[in-house]
């Protein structure tokens, strides 16, 4: 069970309890340390004087069923920490842990003298868990009420089964431990125990409450200085492409003079006719735009093209870094190409970004249409 995801970040003590109970029980089972945590009165205390077991018996559970029930109860009672506050809740847990360390062995020893059916104390923080349970039932309000066969149930009814399972897992040892924990939790709430106003020093609570910062990527954004990003170091063009790129630029600047010499006269005449008609159409459209609408100023490339490091990468790949004039695309040029070719805005921008000339953009779109 990952407490980092299921418990809110402001409930650090609940997280600590979940991790401590589960981890200590698993470690004790893996390294075969379970025999060092229970208390046998006649063998450990009276014969071998192993009084150090009184300090350790609450740290682990013997089996996974008790671990699961304890974790379920602590998780469902997590609102106790939110209502009491993490500092007070941590002080309450330490107070009850120390109190249960001595109260349960004393009462269990007296019970064994009277009834002769209690040989050892079952290990586990059952005393602390039932003390927390009393606070949960008393201070946390119910939110769901269900009536079944004239019996009213609340959302706290889900705690009954793990409570019974944990209290009767090793009767009578666990039952005595649970009963004493519930009773001492009630006495603490009613301020019938000495030292209920004691608080744990805050320096011991801060480590459990300090937030954990996790970065899944470096904190970089486009709003920072774009000069720190150099796309040419990421994409180095082969040296053999320089001559080909220069030749392509010359063809873009002089589309008619650099036409293929092997074209037939009919194809060259058709090309010239298309260019002339597109120029006339563009000129007439500009005249209508100037009459009906005021002239539009040049818009920066940031309105239609990427910005920041992405813009630098786009400039290098598209050749705009070699020809800065391609970065200024006018809105009326986009509308002109769209009207002439009846194409989408993205296609018009793509054609203009290669030449920034309406005539050449129309020619490029015509060539693309002829290829299809």
From Swiss-Prot:
Q: Pathway, according to UniProt?
A: Protein modification; protein ubiquitination
Region Disordered: start-end pairs: 246-314
| Residue pairs linked by disulfide bridges in the UniProt entry | none
Transmembrane helix keyword on record: yes
Q: Where is there biased composition of kind Low complexity?
A: 269-284
Is Transmembrane helix tagged as a keyword? yes
Which keywords annotate this record? Golgi apparatus, Membrane, Phosphoprotein, Transferase, Transmembrane, Transmembrane helix, Ubl conjugation pathway
Q: Which positions does the record annotate as the modified residue Phosphoserine?
A: 264
Membrane topology qualifier: Multi-pass membrane protein
What are the Phosphothreonine sites (modified residues) in this protein?
266
Membrane-spanning ranges: 26-46, 54-74, 95-115, 126-146, 160-180
Q: What is its EC number?
A: 2.3.2.27
Alphabetized GO MF terms: transferase activity; ubiquitin binding; ubiquitin protein ligase binding
- Domain of life, per UniProt, equals Eukaryota
Show the ranges annotated as biased composition (Polar residues).
249-268, 286-305
Q: Which reaction does it catalyse?
A: S-ubiquitinyl-[E2 ubiquitin-conjugating enzyme]-L-cysteine + [acceptor protein]-L-lysine = [E2 ubiquitin-conjugating enzyme]-L-cysteine + N(6)-ubiquitinyl-[acceptor protein]-L-lysine
Subcellular location(s) per record: Golgi apparatus membrane
A GO cellular component annotated for this chain's UniProt record is: Golgi membrane
Q: Which residues form the UBA domain?
A: 332-368
Q: Where is the major localization of this protein?
A: Golgi
Q: Name one GO biological process term.
A: SREBP signaling pathway
Q: What does this protein do?
A: Component of the DSC E3 ubiquitin ligase complex which is required for the sre1 transcriptional activator proteolytic cleavage to release the soluble transcription factor from the membrane in low oxygen or sterol conditions. The complex also plays an important role in the multivesicular body (MVB) pathway and functions in a post-endoplasmic reticulum pathway for protein degradation.
Q: How does it assemble?
A: Component of the DSC E3 ubiquitin ligase complex composed of dsc1, dsc2, dsc3 and dsc4.
UniProt name for this protein: DSC E3 ubiquitin ligase complex subunit 2
